[in-house]
């Protein structure tokens, strides 16, 4: 039969093992996620069909009016440091030298764990008539800002200089290109984000590698007998050359004069 002192020693050893295991898990996460990140960098939205300029600069100015969008995404609600994304953007068309152009501006703030990704981008597109539709060629230039909140990392008594326990940040330039073809009833777009694959240094020992990401999108408008109803299927495929994601959406849209209501599933 164990006495109280032996039981206390056993419990202390188990507690110590739990602390060591916790530190090991934290260090492993930092090794995978802080030293060099090679995952898809951009956030995804279920309403991608209304936010095409966020991944294809050639889509700016495709509407005949000023277009302003704002989106907020919250994942894993209730968990500490859960992913949160906010984006606001605006674009509009204009005419110059007998050509239609598009210009846009977007601001994004994306928080994932102890990382904060920010992007400020300016977009431009040139539109030309082609085969009964409109072909748009777009370019986007911007600034990426990265921050890691190391002050919230608990490594216990460890003093390993590879793991920052203070706030570190860095920035870099970013370049994206896109093509967008729009016909009467359908459209297709192809774009590449982060073409320069920038590497952003976070302090003296860590870096964030951002791989180029490619997007293919398309959609079709199916008119029904009711002139106010339209079925709009659409698709978005995203890949960085290693992993990929596909979104398939179907919407039923009711539109009468300036009023619009839709429902769908992705």
Task: Kindly give the residue locations of the regions a language model identified.
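Bacterial Sec-dependent N-terminal signal peptides
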Residues: 1-44, 50, 250
């Amino acid at each position: 039969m164990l006495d109280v002192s032996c039981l206390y020693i056993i419990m202390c050893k188990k507690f110590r093992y739990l602390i060591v295991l916790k530190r090991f898990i934290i260090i492993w996460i930092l090794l995978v996620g802080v030293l060099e990140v090679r995952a898809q960098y951009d956030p995804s939205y279920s309403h991608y069909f209304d936010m095409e300029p966020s991944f294809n600069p050639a889509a700016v100015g495709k509407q005949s009016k000023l277009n302003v969008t704002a989106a907020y995404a919250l994942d894993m609600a209730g968990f500490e440091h859960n992913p949160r994304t906010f984006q606001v953007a605006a674009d509009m068309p204009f005419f110059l030298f007998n050509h239609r152009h598009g210009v846009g501006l977007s601001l994004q703030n994306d928080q994932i764990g102890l990382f904060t990704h920010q992007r400020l981008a300016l977009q431009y597109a040139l539109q030309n008539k082609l085969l009964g539709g409109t072909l748009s060629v777009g370019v986007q230039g911007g600034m990426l800002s990265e921050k890691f909140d190391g002050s919230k990392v608990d490594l216990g008594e460890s003093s390993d200089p590879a793991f920052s326990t203070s706030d570190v940040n860095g920035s870099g330039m970013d370049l994206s290109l896109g093509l967008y073809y729009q016909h009467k009833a359908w459209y297709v777009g192809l774009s590449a984000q982060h073409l320069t694959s920038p590497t952003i240094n976070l302090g003296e020992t860590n870096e964030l590698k951002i791989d180029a990401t490619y997007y293919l999108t398309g959609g079709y408008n199916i008119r029904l007998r009711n002139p106010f109803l339209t079925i709009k299927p659409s698709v978005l495929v995203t890949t960085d050359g290693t992993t990929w994601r596909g979104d398939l959406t179907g919407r039923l849209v009711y539109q009468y004069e300036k009023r619009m209501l839709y429902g769908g599933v992705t």
